[in-house]
């Protein structure tokens, strides 16, 4: 039976949960793959959708914990998982270069978007990402950040650096939730603020609101907003007990024709959440 962990900070409780899952995995007859992934692949329902197809194709049971990319990479460094599915290319490359992971493969992408109230009090609609954030800062309009070192949060900080020399973390109008993307969107909606989200999670949120969300897309299409997801196998040199075979099979399956079609067909409200772009291996 597939198990996924609650989206919480890396803590004693998360590590204990992963140890227990790994122990139960070794107790059964079928192979189990332990994966750490970003919240967006979980919040959107993508992994629930893919998991039974992967198990049928390979006989491997997929179990995952969903957290921010920074914390997912930490789980990989600590040898608590076999594989990562994450979306911060710069941090991923550093992870591999440091010897913690091997075989980083792009799998799919979508984009980041700036969303906010339809009235758009900061006047950001149609601007570039940097221009939109500069306008938010200039108007001191409420901005809600994940503040959790996730891939989305790190992208947001990168965009702020391009937008203004004065970083917003200590400003009263800048709120950090320390939570996942869906929860952060809900906080922004409750307070009529702006936030940065990946498009897939926004479509999921839009779906939960019956197609009429209180926050709308205001900034999109900037080339800086591309959001690439990749798999990384945890290094067996650093982590002797990882299930390297299962990790390789999942990575290869995600790049193959079946998963590419499934990812491309995965839609809510008739909208595609992720675009497959893996090179078939």
Tell what function each PLM region has:
Residues 78, 109-110:
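Short connector loops at helix/strand junctions that flank enzyme active sites
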Residues 83-109:
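Acidic, polar ligand-binding/catalytic clefts
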Residues 2-12:
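Bacterial N-terminal signal peptides that target proteins for export
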Residues 114:
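Serine endopeptidase catalytic core focused on the charge-relay Asp
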Residues 28-61, 65, 70, 74-80, ...:
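Exported/periplasmic ABC-transporter solute-binding proteins
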Residues 11-22:
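Bacterial N-terminal signal peptides
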Residues 23-27:
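Sec/Tat signal peptide C-region and signal peptidase I cleavage site
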């Amino acid at each position: 039976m597939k198990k996924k962990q609650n989206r919480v900070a890396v803590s004693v409780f998360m590590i204990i949960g992963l140890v227990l899952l790994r122990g139960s995995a070794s107790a059964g007859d079928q192979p189990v793959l332990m994966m750490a992934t970003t919240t967006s692949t979980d919040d959107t329902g993508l992994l629930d959708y893919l998991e039974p197809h992967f198990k049928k194709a390979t006989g491997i049971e997929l179990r995952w914990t969903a957290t921010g990319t920074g914390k997912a990479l930490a789980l990989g460094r600590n040898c608590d998982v076999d594989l990562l599915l994450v979306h911060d290319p710069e941090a991923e490359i550093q992870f591999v270069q440091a010897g913690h992971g091997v075989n980083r493969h792009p799998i799919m992408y979508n984009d980041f978007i700036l969303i906010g109230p339809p009235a758009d009090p900061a006047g950001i609609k149609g601007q570039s990402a940097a221009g939109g954030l500069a306008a938010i800062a200039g108007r001191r309009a409420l901005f809600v950040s994940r503040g959790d070192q996730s891939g989305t949060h790190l992208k947001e900080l990168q965009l702020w650096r391009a937008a203004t020399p004065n970083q917003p973390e200590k400003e009263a109008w800048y709120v950090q939730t320390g939570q996942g993307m869906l929860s952060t969107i809900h906080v922004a909606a409750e307070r009529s603020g702006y936030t940065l989200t990946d498009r897939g999670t926004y479509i999921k949120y839009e779906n939960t609101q019956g197609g009429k969300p209180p926050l709308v897309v205001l900034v999109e299409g900037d080339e800086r907003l591309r959001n690439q997801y990749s798999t990384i196998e945890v290094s067996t040199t650093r982590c002797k007990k990882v299930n390297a075979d299962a990790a390789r099979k999942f990575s290869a399956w995600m790049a193959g024709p079946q998963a590419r079609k499934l990812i491309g067909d995965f839609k809510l409200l008739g909208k595609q959440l992720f675009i497959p772009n893996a090179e078939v291996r």
